[in-house]
């Protein structure tokens, strides 16, 4: 099975995986509206891959089979200053 990956034109580090290039039939319209104009990043055979950057390959495969798409959002940013302040016992 081929997988097409698109990056969001509105949200940084947000990617949409779909089963077929330029086929967004299974993606909810509300998600596409939030995502903006999809920009193709790559197309690859997902069956031959063992890993995918920060995405869990098993979750991507399962989502593609069940829903027809997978949305990868960036992990939350860590506020190092806030963590350091807490470690020092400083409260806001």
From Swiss-Prot:
Residues 1-85 form the YcgL domain. Gene3D superfamilies: YcgL domain (3.10.510.20). Coiled coil: none annotated. It comes from the Bacteria. PROSITE patterns: YCGL. This is YcgL domain-containing protein Shewmr4_2172. InterPro entries: YcgL-like_sf (IPR038068), YcgL_dom (IPR027354). Pfam families: YcgL.
